[in-house]
């Protein structure tokens, strides 16, 4: 299936851990759980880089990975073929992932243990659906979380109160 990750967006909200597999230069595989596989845009995801471990070593030596993500509502599973592009250590993506990781750590009693070192950005080359039993899909509807994110993005560019109010009203009209 071509790489259009908008159709599996629910899998990329952090509700279920993902599995990431890499290989070193001689082909030895490594698989580990990833705290986050986060949606970046229609062609890219970001994985949390928390430790300098075997997965990180493999990606730097061989920039291909495979991730298995799970839809938290239908339990559908998808395999993503990924190509590593870069690591971001500052900016909106990094801060968003850092905040989400802090929430995951706090919820699991691991506050202070997890520390985000970077957001590894990958291009999604291919998406493959994994056969198996699933729950029925939810009725189609708008993604309010995506609408909130778009509105927040628009509001973040405001430099004064008047612009903030104007943009808030425009966002409400456009998104909700």
Features from the language model and the residues they span:
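Signal-transmission linkers at sensory-effector interfaces
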Residues: 133-162
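A generic local secondary-structure boundary/capping motif
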Residues: 8-9, 35, 56, 107-113
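Short beta-strand segments
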Residues: 13-49, 80, 171
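Short, structured beta-strand-loop surface elements
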Residues: 54-101
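Solvent-exposed polar/charged
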Residues: 10-13, 61, 174
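Helix-loop-beta substructure at the N-terminus of cytosolic sensory domains
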Residues: 158-176
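Short, low-complexity N-terminal regulatory "tails/caps" that precede and couple sensory modules
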Residues: 91, 103-143
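Short, basic/aromatic recognition patches
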Residues: 1-17
């Amino acid at each position: 299936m071509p790489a259009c990750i908008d159709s599996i967006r629910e899998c990329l909200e952090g509700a279920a851990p993902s599995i990431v597999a890499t290989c070193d230069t001689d082909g030895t595989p490594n698989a580990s759980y990833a705290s986050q596989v986060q949606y970046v845009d229609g062609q890219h995801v970001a994985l949390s880089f928390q430790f300098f471990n075997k997965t990180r070593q493999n990606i730097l030596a061989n920039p291909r990975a495979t991730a298995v993500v799970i839809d938290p509502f239908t339990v559908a599973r998808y395999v993503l073929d990924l190509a590593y592009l870069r690591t971001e250590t500052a900016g909106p993506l990094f801060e968003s992932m850092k905040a989400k990781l802090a929430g995951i750590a706090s919820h699991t009693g691991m506050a202070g243990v997890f520390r985000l070192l970077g957001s590894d950005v990958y291009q999604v080359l291919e998406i493959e659906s994994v056969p198996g039993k699933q729950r029925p899909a939810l009725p189609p509807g708008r993604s309010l979380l995506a609408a909130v994110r778009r509105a927040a993005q628009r509001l973040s560019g405001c430099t004064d109160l008047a612009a903030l109010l104007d943009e808030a009203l425009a966002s409400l009209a456009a998104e909700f």
